[in-house]
A protein has these predicted regions:
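Catalytic-loop of the protein kinase fold
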Residues: 175-234
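Conserved structural core of kinase catalytic domains
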Residues: 112, 116-171, 198, 204
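Terminal C-lobe "cap" of eukaryotic-type protein kinase domains
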Residues: 319-345
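Conserved hydrophobic alpha-helix
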Residues: 171-178, 317
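Protein kinase subdomain VIII
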Residues: 212-222, 236-273, 278, 285
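ATP-binding glycine-rich loop module of kinase domains
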Residues: 37-134
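Conserved C-terminal C-lobe helix
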Residues: 304-320
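Regulatory extensions appended to serine/threonine kinase catalytic cores
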Residues: 10, 344-396
Length: 396
């Protein structure tokens, strides 16, 4: 009986390995442009080389040990990581929407240029470079934008209240910045917030599996946000719009409901015209509500301890009546006032998962306290503050 089971298992593994020796349809574009991208200074992973041969073939090692098997296809068909040949740094490539489809390029270029680029409140992902394709794709996409290599903001656990305060301060400031320029993000959901990988990770993590290093030579080892403060960024402009300031001053711009990835927006359920700026406020508030305050078990998110001080503000941001939600200017002011009331001890308190009993939280507290004492002795701030490195200037 065991021999039959082993034979079935071996056959299924063999079929899976043969299947993974082929590129997925979403990968073909990148393979076909491997040499062109290389000539423009960007190197894709070995899997996308035109003459790629699966590295696990002819070996007895388990295929998942190999990068070109374990990270076998882009998570998003129009995005792929690459290495910038000039300095060896990872970047993200994006096959952008054509202007006839969205304002993605317009908004991306706007927030990456002029005074907006240098504004410290700007948490929009920047465009490093734009590459015009030799020939447009069948759906009209004709250029690739090169952006920083970022990782999901919540991949590393938050250890203290101060780290949560820093995150909220940055994303509130970032959305306030966009709204101050009459830009509605229109999809300010959880996975459109990212963070710079470089402070937290000694080696870049893999875009497909952040638990592994980009070179697949071992596990990635994230560090503490308190010791290595990070900067958070908004991404994804394919639904974003900039409104005429005169129109916004004289009347509220409205759009039809049902856009973006957050389907819990109350106006959407009522199928009524939406104020996109009020929807943005709701969506960002809902990110924080689901990640820290109430949880969202369907997404494996659970409420955290010691974050009740945000409850009233987040409740207002996610109010059913959009006219009763605060503006982002008001959110920023209120959150600054709330933050000032938090003691140094509160800021260094744990934000542990409420799934686990309070007893476990308290049993771990002495360890947490000793770690925080070491941070205090090293003069590390209770609320981390990211300082850009001196060599962080973006290429023109």
């Amino acid at each position: 009986m065991s021999t039959v089971k082993e034979t079935i298992r071996d056959d299924s593994e063999s079929e899976l390995n043969v299947w993974n020796e082929k590129l997925w349809s979403s990968e073909i574009f990148w393979r076909d442009h491997y040499d062109w991208l290389k000539s423009n200074g960007y190197l894709l992973r070995p899997r996308y080389h035109p003459d790629w041969v699966p590295s696990w073939t002819g070996t007895k090692r388990f295929p998942l040990f190999f990068e070109d098997y374990g990270a076998q296809f882009p998570l998003f068909p129009y995005n792929l990581d690459a290495i910038r040949v000039a300095d060896g740094k990872p970047v993200m490539l994006r096959l952008a929407d054509p202007p006839s489809v969205s304002d993605e390029l317009k908004i991306g270029r706007l927030v990456s240029s002029g005074d907006m680029r240098s504004d410290p409140r700007n948490h929009c992902v920047q465009i490093y470079d734009t590459l015009e394709l030799p020939e447009a794709t069948s759906n009209g996409r004709s250029c690739i934008v090169v952006m920083p290599y970022l990782v999901p903001w919540d991949q590393v656990k938050f250890q203290t209240v101060g780290e949560v305060v820093d995150f909220c301060s940055q994303v509130f400031e970032g959305l306030q910045f966009m709204h101050s320029h009459n830009i509605a993000h229109n999809d300010a959901k959880n996975d459109n917030i990212m963070m710079d990988w470089s402070p937290l990770y000694p080696k870049p993590p893999h875009s497909h599996d952040t638990s592994m290093r980009l070179d697949w030579k071992g596990a990635s080892k994230p560090r503490s946000r308190t010791l290595y403060p990070v900067r958070y960024h908004f991404i994804d402009w394919d639904l974003s719009k900039q409104y005429n300031p005169l129109i916004r001053t004289n009347r509220i711009p409205m759009r039809l409901p049902g856009y973006g990835g957050d389907r819990t927006v109350p106006e959407f359920n009522r199928k009524e015209p939406c104020n996109p700026f009020a929807v943005d406020v709701y969506c960002l508030g809902n990110v924080i509500r689901e990640k820290f305050i109430e949880g969202a078990p369907i997404f494996d998110d659970y409420p955290r301890r010691n974050v009740g001080f945000m409850r009233e503000l987040i409740a207002d941001m996610t109010h059913d009546d959009p006219s009763k939600r605060p503006t982002m200017d008001e959110v920023v002011v209120r959150f600054e006032e709330i933050s000032k009331t938090l003691s140094w001890w509160k800021l260094r308190s744990r934000v542990s998962d409420k799934r686990f009993p309070l007893l476990l939280h308290r049993l771990y507290s002495p360890i947490h306290c000793s770690v925080q004492l070491s941070h205090i002795l090293r003069l590390k701030r209770a609320i981390p503050k990211h300082t850009p490195p001196k060599d962080s200037a973006l290429p023109s």
